[in-house]
């Protein structure tokens, strides 16, 4: 199993180009199942999860071509089973459910795996599809959906805000008979990107970016080309890296409007922020890092996917900071690893109290999920001595070419093949 070796006490400086957003690319790739014509996608990040999704599409019968961009043709799809062997590694595989049920009237999707950071129930997906006329059974570890004819438009009130739940039902509704209204819908930029992609193929979706979506079903979607939006979480991770190491970096090919809550907190932490249409510069040179209070919540509030990185920021800031996690009940698994490095962090339920740590020390630590692994890498740059981060397959799921990007910023990091 690969690991990272990081030599600490280094400063991140320079420019980095941001990749396409994993959390936008995956649903867009699954949405190609709704269309039988060729689709060309650009700015798709080269990630383990993207590769898994492409394998799954091919297993279902799609033809794909990857040459910097991704071309998908699902006209020959003749299989509606998303097997455990692929789904177990990636929770986003649940996003095959809506498109398969809508276009083919049948979907067997294994109950998903992925990061072990909470219960993430599938009942929201199941209930919404049932309201649209699907008959669903959960048996043998699979969600099995069957539809007589077409799905029917429905009024769906989601019991809780769910990004993948919103995406699955929105995709299914594009080919349903009649109008579907989804209330308490997720507002995340990745949901908006998916809606924009579907509309580019001929879907009729209104309200993306608000908590109410209105989808008028169409008979079919046509092919087309689309560019995936930049990754706001990768952007935020690099910005925090510069903040905690006292450096100055510019993120290129990004979108500052996608992470306003993060930028506000970085300014509170003492960073100087400048931004343009597609770039952000953070300068922490000679400035004192201050702790911040954050509370994760659905967009446009502070994103849960930036919580671990800000836990590191608070651990090395001068003073006491507080991090409250409201999205997932088990998303502080990075804290014991940071404590191994000398961090003074106390957990009280869903709150992490981070007190001023004089100096983190290098240690051997274990990545437990995608964003936790990124936080441990950042901690390694701040620490004195060398840090080994094990189980970095997590980080490969969500960050494209991360060690080379960090090396380009002056980070002393190398991959040790397992």
Swiss-Prot record:
Domain of life: Bacteria
Enzyme class: transferase
Residues reported to bind UDP-N-acetyl-alpha-D-glucosamine: 91, 305, 327
UniProt modified residues of type 2-(S-cysteinyl)pyruvic acid O-phosphothioketal: 115
Gene Ontology molecular function, alphabetical: UDP-N-acetylglucosamine 1-carboxyvinyltransferase activity
Record: active site: 115
Principal localisation: cytoplasm
Binding site for phosphoenolpyruvate: 22-23
Enzyme Commission numbers on file: 2.5.1.7
Keyword DNA damage: no
Coiled-coil segments: none
GO-annotated cellular components: cytoplasm
Function: Cell wall formation. Adds enolpyruvyl to UDP-N-acetylglucosamine.
Full protein name: UDP-N-acetylglucosamine 1-carboxyvinyltransferase
Gene source species: Aeromonas hydrophila subsp. hydrophila (strain ATCC 7966 / DSM 30187 / BCRC 13018 / CCUG 14551 / JCM 1027 / KCTC 2358 / NCIMB 9240 / NCTC 8049)
Gene: murA
């Amino acid at each position: 199993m690969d690991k990272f070796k990081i030599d600490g006490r280094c400063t991140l400086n320079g420019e980095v180009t941001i990749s396409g957003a994993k959390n936008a690319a995956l649903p867009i790739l699954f949405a190609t199942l709704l269309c039988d014509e060729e689709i060309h996608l650009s700015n798709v990040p080269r990630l383990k999860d993207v590769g898994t999704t492409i394998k799954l599409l091919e297993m279902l019968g799609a033809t794909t071509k990857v040459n910097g961009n991704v071309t998908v043709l699902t006209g020959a799809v003749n299989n509606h089973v998303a097997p455990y062997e692929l789904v177990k590694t990636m929770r986003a595989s649940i996003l095959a459910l809506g498109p398969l049920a809508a276009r083919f009237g049948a979907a067997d999707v294994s109950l998903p795996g992925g990061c072990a950071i909470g219960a993430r129930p599938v009942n929201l997906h199941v209930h919404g599809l049932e309201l649209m006329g699907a008959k669903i059974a959960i048996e043998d570890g699979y969600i099995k959906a069957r539809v007589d004819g077409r799905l029917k438009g429905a009024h769906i009130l989601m019991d809780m805000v769910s990004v993948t739940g919103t995406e699955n039902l929105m995709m299914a509704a594009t080919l349903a008979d009649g109008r579907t209204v989804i209330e308490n819908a997720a507002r995340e930029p990745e949901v908006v990107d998916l809606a924009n992609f579907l509309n580019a193929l001929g879907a009729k979706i209104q309200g993306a970016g608000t908590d109410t979506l209105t989808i008028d079903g169409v008979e079919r979607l046509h092919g087309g080309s689309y560019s995936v939006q930049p990754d706001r979480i990768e952007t935020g991770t690099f910005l925090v890296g510069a903040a905690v190491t006292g450096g100055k970096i510019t993120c290129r090919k990004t979108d500052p409007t996608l992470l306003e809550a993060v930028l506000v907190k970085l300014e509170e932490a003492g960073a100087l922020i400048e931004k343009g249409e597609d770039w952000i510069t953070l300068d922490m040179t000679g400035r004192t890092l201050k702790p911040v209070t954050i509370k994760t919540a659905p967009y446009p509030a502070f994103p849960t996917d930036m919580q671990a990185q800000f836990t590191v920021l608070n651990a090395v800031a001068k003073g006491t900071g507080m991090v409250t996690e409201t999205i997932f009940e088990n998303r502080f698994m990075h804290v014991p690893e940071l404590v191994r490095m000398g961090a003074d962090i106390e957990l009280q339920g869903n709150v992490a109290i981070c007190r001023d740590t004089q100096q983190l020390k290098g240690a051997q630590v274990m990545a437990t999920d995608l964003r936790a692994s990124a936080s441990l890498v950042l901690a390694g740059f701040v620490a004195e001595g060398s840090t080994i981060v094990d189980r970095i397959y997590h980080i490969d799921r969500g960050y494209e070419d991360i060690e080379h990007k960090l090396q380009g910023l002056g980070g002393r990091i190398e991959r040790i093949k397992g």
